[in-house]
């Protein structure tokens, strides 16, 4: 059947900010969907609050709303745009929950909007645990024994029947939020209490424990003619009990017998039919008891999910693209496969390789968090690798993580029993502990007993260990041994450490013996048909599939797995660079290993190499490209710190680096040399010094005065940074933080209190500067720029300051020798402009600045990298001629970027949320943007989009450090004028009352029960009578009362503000929300407004 012709306009809901459990994979899915809709002639309206996405590029959809994804806001967009249909299956749980709310509120019916891709009934059947149980039964499957509960009393009764341990799963949450394993009553109160709160329907499923069973997923698609295909089977290496997003997974499933696979397949097909998914995809999770083979259906997602992105990249089968076509009414046999161009989508993909995905965690950012892996997802990113066998794919995936100690090691003196005891608890180290225990002499039976990891995988670890012994014991590294090692995924560095030689020496020997990888193709059909999209992976096989190409290629190194400090923003710059270079006629090559991202889509670049971003793997890709037609050069400054770290080594190997040279990159990172650049430019940095020991650091701190900011050299995301107020704190820091970069000295800077921090993104071509944007931070200096809210254009900086910023940026760019993008952080204190740091690369603010000013900076940077000038780009229309981002006219729209933080995901071993206090080390996973005519409404939108809409009435708890009390008086007066009740502890309340401000006193936590019936702030928070918390930490109480209050508020979803600067902005936003209703405006309309403001009132007339 051909597509429907009645759908002229479709609203797509994105997934919003990157959070744990819902990440870049939805930008990848959404971007594909929008492209399909446009190709089919449909008008596309998009709502997504995340500016760091490709899908929110104004060129993609017809109307792009970077607005909060709340039912009320989406209803306004529907009222304004009047779409025919809503496609909610590509924006994760956020989009599904919003669609359900719009349906319940009657909005869809009122405006005649049809839901496509999934119907409400199918969503309810798939997501509602009680209804889904019935579905499984009717489909001939079995569910774990369970009870649905809505209160703690019901939960306690259910446990009488199920017995401990029980699994707790809330309805309608994603990434396992609020779920966990309860071993006793205390656990049940803690986990089930949180689960009832996180579930929008206050509904929780308690089920019998299936801990230690094997876990599988099937990725399915079905069309309206009842054609069903299984796109991919995925097996978790970790047994049930670890969230699938935190587990190492492998595709295709390795340990299923054919009969077991057919059983799972039959159940899946029956379930997808029973649920009624008839125009799209879903994934179904199973548990299989290794003892008796009993199969239990765990759950399904009636939408495109994290697993769909993995399955798409693993198979080359574009699930999101095909799901969108199905939603438009096509059937599978009518949709051609892009890769083969001969087979339809109804052909199930066939794999002649193995894919392994390994999660990446960020526990180092939350030292207080419990690192045990449970059913609540905690990983912040993932790496994927492809090999001809499991061992090769696993070892490639592990080295793709780029974390110290992520590659398998082979210590000869380990205690197998101690390692197995450690491995019996699921943590990030379980895989290496198990492999090393086997290396040290543990048996497969003992390892299975301790970990419940299937013996087939344990046998593969033994095989890797045997090859390691062969490498260690061989008299010489001959060709046969090197080939065997490489076929099992050993890197030159691993071989070197086993042979006590340098990786470069191993590489030399390997090349001399002619042991080089070949590149194979992901083609969906195991080479049965020709593949037209070059999507490659390396293997030490016999023949290569890289075809000769005309013209030299430009290679872009991606940013690897997402992590805190290096996320989707860098992928955005890589994708934009590819687009700009392809438009200019260059052949582009992308090298990356992150399955979630747009950059690893097979049609973004001319060729995609799905490879680890290590020196060894990148040099081999360059060699393959050289051999097949030549390389113009490599871009290293777009993907964050990952490719930047390789710049000098690549240059040393004779690889041409495009854009800013490695010498210039080093100059900006090197303390002493950069100080000379500033000196020559007549600019100042805060007083600073370097230290290699505590005595050194103490001497520098005494010279420049406390507080000081201490950090290691060469880090991204403020890793290991701290503000230190005393000698004791300095001693503690030196004792704990010297491991980060052992060969680099520690940096000690004077910390500027109460300074305004300014962030600048600019382009420089060697003669001319284009100032991309000047952002003013809302919090004072001292909070990492990635965690701080910022506004563009600045709201309190005068033209003279902007002129000084422009001059300083130009002098630094020229002094460093930048060709392309540079990001500089300034601090303005007592009217002195200090230079904090300069990064000659794409920064995490590039997407935000590009969206706010309507100028694609990363595209322009790529063109400068291949030799074009800013003047050329102005002439070509890529950069504006009349203005730049530092001289935006009055009347330009105001954009606010706000960080989104993952504190609810991380709990201490006692089960409390980790502290939400911000500092110089970055902790946010994502960002949102609020954009409007004025700052106050733009800021209000950013807070709503970040998940904590500000209250417009109610009770506000305030408790501030002494240094903030003067500021608080004015702010509290405004609160009272707005009709809020102010609640405070003794000291702060006394100050407020002396200034004529009524304040209700509550007891400090330590004084619980001592005051006359006032109750503590914690009791009031739990009773739901506090709507907003302002708590700024003082040196002493930061870890006691303050922490308890912030942790309780965070876990209860009450907005917590930790600086008076941000609280001031919140007050403006609350006033704006009270006085008028905000409107929704598309990016395209904002851009038109900006052009109108530039042209001036005459043009408008």
Swiss-Prot record:
What are the MGS-like domain coordinates in residue numbering?
948-1093
Write the signal peptide boundaries.
Answer: none
Highest taxon of the lineage: Bacteria
Give the residues the record marks as binding ATP 1.
129, 169, 175-176, 208, 210, 215, 241-243, 285, 299
> What residues does the ATP-grasp domain cover?
133-328, 675-866
Which CDD domains did the record assign?
A: MGS_CPS_II
User: For this protein, what does the record note about how its cofactor is bound?
Assistant: Binds 4 Mg(2+) or Mn(2+) ions per subunit.
**Gene Ontology biological-process annotations:** 'de novo' UMP biosynthetic process; glutamine metabolic process; L-arginine biosynthetic process
Cited InterPro entries:
ATP-grasp, ATP_grasp_subdomain_1, CarbamoylP_synth_lsu, CarbamoylP_synth_lsu_oligo, CarbamoylP_synth_lsu_oligo_sf, CbamoylP_synth_lsu-like_ATP-bd, CbamoylP_synth_lsu_CPSase_dom, MGS-like_dom
Q: What PROSITE patterns does this protein's entry cite?
A: ATP_GRASP, CPSASE_1, CPSASE_2, MGS
**Cellular component terms per the entry's GO annotation:** cytoplasm
Query: What pathway or pathways are given for this protein in its record?
Result: Amino-acid biosynthesis; L-arginine biosynthesis; carbamoyl phosphate from bicarbonate: step 1/1; Pyrimidine metabolism; UMP biosynthesis via de novo pathway; (S)-dihydroorotate from bicarbonate: step 1/3
State the Pfam families in the record.
Answer: CPSase_L_D2, CPSase_L_D3, MGS
Give the region (Allosteric domain) as residue ranges. Answer: 948-1101
Positions binding Mn(2+) 4 in this chain are: 837, 839
Region of interest: Carboxyphosphate synthetic domain: 1-402
Instruction: Cite the binding residues for Mg(2+) 1.
Output: 285, 299
**Keywords of this entry:** Amino-acid biosynthesis, Arginine biosynthesis, ATP-binding, Ligase, Magnesium, Manganese, Metal-binding, Nucleotide-binding, Pyrimidine biosynthesis, Repeat
Chain positions recorded as Mg(2+) 2 binding sites: 299, 301
Location of the region described as Oligomerization domain in the Swiss-Prot/TrEMBL record: 403-544
Query: Per UniProt, where does Mn(2+) 3 bind?
Result: 825, 837
What are the protein's GO molecular function terms? ATP binding; carbamoyl-phosphate synthase (ammonia) activity; carbamoyl-phosphate synthase (glutamine-hydrolyzing) activity; metal ion binding
Please list the residues that bind Mn(2+) 1.
285, 299
Q: What free text does the record give on domains?
A: The large subunit is composed of 2 ATP-grasp domains that are involved in binding the 2 ATP molecules needed for carbamoyl phosphate synthesis. The N-terminal ATP-grasp domain (referred to as the carboxyphosphate synthetic component) catalyzes the ATP-dependent phosphorylation of hydrogencarbonate to carboxyphosphate and the subsequent nucleophilic attack by ammonia to form a carbamate intermediate.
How does this chain assemble?
Composed of two chains; the small (or glutamine) chain promotes the hydrolysis of glutamine to ammonia, which is used by the large (or ammonia) chain to synthesize carbamoyl phosphate. Tetramer of heterodimers (alpha,beta)4.
- Which named protein is this? Carbamoyl phosphate synthase large chain
């Amino acid at each position: 059947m051909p597509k429907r012709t009645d759908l002229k306009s479709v609203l797509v809901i994105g997934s919003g900010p990157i959070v744990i459990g819902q990440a870049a994979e939805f930008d990848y899915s959404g971007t594909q969907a929008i492209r399909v809709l446009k190709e089919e002639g449909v008008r596309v309206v998009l709502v997504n609050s995340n500016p760091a996405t490709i899908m929110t590029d104004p060129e993609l959809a017809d109307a792009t709303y970077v607005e909060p994804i709340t039912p009320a806001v989406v209803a306004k967009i529907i009222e304004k745009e009047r779409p025919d249909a809503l496609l909610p299956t590509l924006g994760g749980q956020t989009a599904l929950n919003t669609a359900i709310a719009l349906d319940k509120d009657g909005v869809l019916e009122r405006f005649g909007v049809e839901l496509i891709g999934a119907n409400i009934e199918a969503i309810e059947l798939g997501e509602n645990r009680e209804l889904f149980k019935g579905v499984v039964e009717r489909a001939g499957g079995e569910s774990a024994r369970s009870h649905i509960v809505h209160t703690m009393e019901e939960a306690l009764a259910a446990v009488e029947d199920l017995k401990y341990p029980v699994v707790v799963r809330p309805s309608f949450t994603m990434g396992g939020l609020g779920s966990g394993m309860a071993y006793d009553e205390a656990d049940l109160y803690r986990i089930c209490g949180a689960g009832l709160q996180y579930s929008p329907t206050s509904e929780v499923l308690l089920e019998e424990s299936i801990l230690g069973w094997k876990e599988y997923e099937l990725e399915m698609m079905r069309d309206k003619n009842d054609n069903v295909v299984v796109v991919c089977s995925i097996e978790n290496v970790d047994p049930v009990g670890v969230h699938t997003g935190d587990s190492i997974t492998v595709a295709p499933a390795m340990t299923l017998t054919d009969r077991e696979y057919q059983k799972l397949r039959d159940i899946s097909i029956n379930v997808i039919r029973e649920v009624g998914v008839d125009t799209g995809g879903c994934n179904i999770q199973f548990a299989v008891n290794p003892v008796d083979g009993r199969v239990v259906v765990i759950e399904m997602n009636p939408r495109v999910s994290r697993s769909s992105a993995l399955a798409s990249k693993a198979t080359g089968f574009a699930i999101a693209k095909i799901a969108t076509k199905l939603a438009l009414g096509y059937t599978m046999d009518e949709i051609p496969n892009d890769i083969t161009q001969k087979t339809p989508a109804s052909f199930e993909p066939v794999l002649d390789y193995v894919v392994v995905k390994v999660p990446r965690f960020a526990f180092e950012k939350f030292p207080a968090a419990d690192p045990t892996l449970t059913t609540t997802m905690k990983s912040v990113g993932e790496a994927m690798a492809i090999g001809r066998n499991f061992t090769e794919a696993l070892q490639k995936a592990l080295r793709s993580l780029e974390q110290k100690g992520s590659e398998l090691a082979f210590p000869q003196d380990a205690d197998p029993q101690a390692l197995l005891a450690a491995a019996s608890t699921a943590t990030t180290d379980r895989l290496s502990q198990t492999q090393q225990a086997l290396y040290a002499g543990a048996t497969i039976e003992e390892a299975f007993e301790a970990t419940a990891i299937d013996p087939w995988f344990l046998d593969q670890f033994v095989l890797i260990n045997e090859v390691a012994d062969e490498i260690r014991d061989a008299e010489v590294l001959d060709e046969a041994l090197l080939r065997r090692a490489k076929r099992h995924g050993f890197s030159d560095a691993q071989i070197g450490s086993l042979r006590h030689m340098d990786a470069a020496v191993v590489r030399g020997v390997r090349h001399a013996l002619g042991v080089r990888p070949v590149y194979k193709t992901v083609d969906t059909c195991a080479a049965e048909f020709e593949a037209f999209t070059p999507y490659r992976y390396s293997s030490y096989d016999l023949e290569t599939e890289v075809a000769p190409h005309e013209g030299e290629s430009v290679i872009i190194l991606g940013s690897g797995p997402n992590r805190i400090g290096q996320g989707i923003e860098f992928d955005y710059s890589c994708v934009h660079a590819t687009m700009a270079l392809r438009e200019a006629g260059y052949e582009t090559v992308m090298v990356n290993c992150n399955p979630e991202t747009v950059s690893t889509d097979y049609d973004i670049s001319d060729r995609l190499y799905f490879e680890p971003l290590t020196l060894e793997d990148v040099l081999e890709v360059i060699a393959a490209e050289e051999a097949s037609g030549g390389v113009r050069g490599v871009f290293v400054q777009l993907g964050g710190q990952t490719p930047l770290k390789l710049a000098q080594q690549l240059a040393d190997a004779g690889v041409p680096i495009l854009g800013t040279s490695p010498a210039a990159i080093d100059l900006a990172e090197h303390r002493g040399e950069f100080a000379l650049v500033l000196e020559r430019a007549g600019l100042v940095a805060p007083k600073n010094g370097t230290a290699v020991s505590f005595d050194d650091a103490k001497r520098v701190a005494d010279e420049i005065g406390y507080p000081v900011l201490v950090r290691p050299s060469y880090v991204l995301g403020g890793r290991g940074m701290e503000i230190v107020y005393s000698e004791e704190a300095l001693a503690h820091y030196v004792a704990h933080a010297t491991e980060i970069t052992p060969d680099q000295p520690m940096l000690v800077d004077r910390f500027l209190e109460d300074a305004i921090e300014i962030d600048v993104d600019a382009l420089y071509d060697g003669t001319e500067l284009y100032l991309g944007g000047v952002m003013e931070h809302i919090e004072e200096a001292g909070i990492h720029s990635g965690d701080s809210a910022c506004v563009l254009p600045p709201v309190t900086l005068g033209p003279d300051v902007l002129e000084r910023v422009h001059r300083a940026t130009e002098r630094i760019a020229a002094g460093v020798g930048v060709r392309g993008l540079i990001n500089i952080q300034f601090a303005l204190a007592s009217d002195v402009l200090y230079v904090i740091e300069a990064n000659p690369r794409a920064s995490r603010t590039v997407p935000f600045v590009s969206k706010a000013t309507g100028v694609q900076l990363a595209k322009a940077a790529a063109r400068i990298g291949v030799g074009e000038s800013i003047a050329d780009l102005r002439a070509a229309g890529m950069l504006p001629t009349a203005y730049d981002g530092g001289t935006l006219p009055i009347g330009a729209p105001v954009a606010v970027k706000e960080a989104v933080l993952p504190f609810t995901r991380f709990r201490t071993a006692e089960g409390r949320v980790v502290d939400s206090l911000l500092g110089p080390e970055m902790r946010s996973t994502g960002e949102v943007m609020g954009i409007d005519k004025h700052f106050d409404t733009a800021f209000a939108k950013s807070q709503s989009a970040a998940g904590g809409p500000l209250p417009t009435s109610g009770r506000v708890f305030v408790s501030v450090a002494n240094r903030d009390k003067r500021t608080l008086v004015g702010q509290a007066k405004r609160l009272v004028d707005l009709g809020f009740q102010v609640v405070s502890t003794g000291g702060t309340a006394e100050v407020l009352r002396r200034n004529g401000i009524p304040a209700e006193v509550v007891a400090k936590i330590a004084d619980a029960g001592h005051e006359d019936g006032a109750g503590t702030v914690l009791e009031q928070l739990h009773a739901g009578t506090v709507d907003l918390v302002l708590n700024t930490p003082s040196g002493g109480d930061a870890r006691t009362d303050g922490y308890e209050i912030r942790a309780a508020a965070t876990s209860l979803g009450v907005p917590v503000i930790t600086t008076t600067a941000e609280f001031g902005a919140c007050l403006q936003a609350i006033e704006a929300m009270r006085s008028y209703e905000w409107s929704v405006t598309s990016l395209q309309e904002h851009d038109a407004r900006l052009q109108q403001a530039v042209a001036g009132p005459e043009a408008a007339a």
